Amino acid sequence: MGDLSNRARKILFAAVTEFIATGDPVGSRTLARKYGLDLSAASIRNVLADLEEAGYLHQPHTSAGRIPTDRALRLFIDALVELRSLSPEQQAELSARFTEIYAGANDPLRETGRYLSELSGAAAVVAAPRAELRALAQLRFIPTKPGQLLAVLVFADGSVANRFISVDEAINEGELTRIHNLLTDVIEGRTLGEIRDLFARRLADERLQIDALRRRAFELGSKATADVTPRSEVVIEGQNRLIDLPEYADVDRLKKLMKALEEREELVDLLDRTLAAGAGEVTVFVGSEAGDLGGGQLSLVAAPYMENGRVAGTVGVLGPTRMDYAKVMPLVDATAAAMTEVRGKVK
């Protein structure tokens, strides 16, 4: 903010606030009338012209007012670093709703998205925990043909991953049962990443060479869990709220948006970058900062949630660059905290 005077910054933030509220280009008379700037419309107009020249505002038509650029929105968002917290009543309502969702919903991630979309008035995105951080509940082997087993990995969240693995020697039913029992004890309470590490350590232990059954169990387990990367589910709810935006009245722009939401590569990349920020951090990607997602017309506000004491997945709001950041940022922050709390209780 060092390149702006206090007066210029005050006028710029008033322009951003008005644009967020109305979605319309902002004129000097509106700012003079509504924001108590103690300046004439002519003085404000001169400052707006300077802000436009500095890259903070854009005038779509010479006769129209001005709209904030991504640079102005970023400046405004950074000034909101002290998030406005939800009221105790709002926080209690949020926690109670998530307790209901995780206690009874068949698809809690989707229900979370629907609820957040409703609260924010924008689209909501929820990413399931990354594979290596997801707890494994069961590991089973099913003989399919000589020299081959089907490994079935059942995660604690109910998702399943299957893969075929080759075996050098036939395994009878009794031996397979003992292997299942042994691996059940080993994987209990551990994530996929922890289980992979455990198998590697056990197989490197020379003392295991004399225990043929245990060694075979860990060899099968290692094969079954190696490179298993069930794609983390990314739920998007409230897409219609994006489609209905005037920013996407243009058909070609709308087609690009729908393609981006369907393929989700840009979105997944942004969510991964949010994970890297760590717990308790709300990350905002404004317009062009979100890459090709939304053609520069959208912003993503996202935060990680925790599971098993680790950063696991992300939750966020996807909306127009003129979204109400002062409302959405604390809402996303509180949602991530509520998800962390509830997921720690519901297994």
Curated annotation (Swiss-Prot):
SUPFAM superfamilies: GAF domain-like, Winged helix' DNA-binding domain. One of its GO terms (molecular function) is DNA binding. It comes from the Bacteria. GO terms for biological process: negative regulation of DNA-templated transcription. PANTHER family: HEAT-INDUCIBLE TRANSCRIPTION REPRESSOR HRCA (PTHR34824:SF1). HAMAP family: HrcA. Negative regulator of class I heat shock genes (grpE-dnaK-dnaJ and groELS operons). Prevents heat-shock induction of these operons. Belongs to the HrcA family. This is Heat-inducible transcription repressor HrcA. It comes from Sorangium cellulosum (strain So ce56) (Polyangium cellulosum (strain So ce56)).
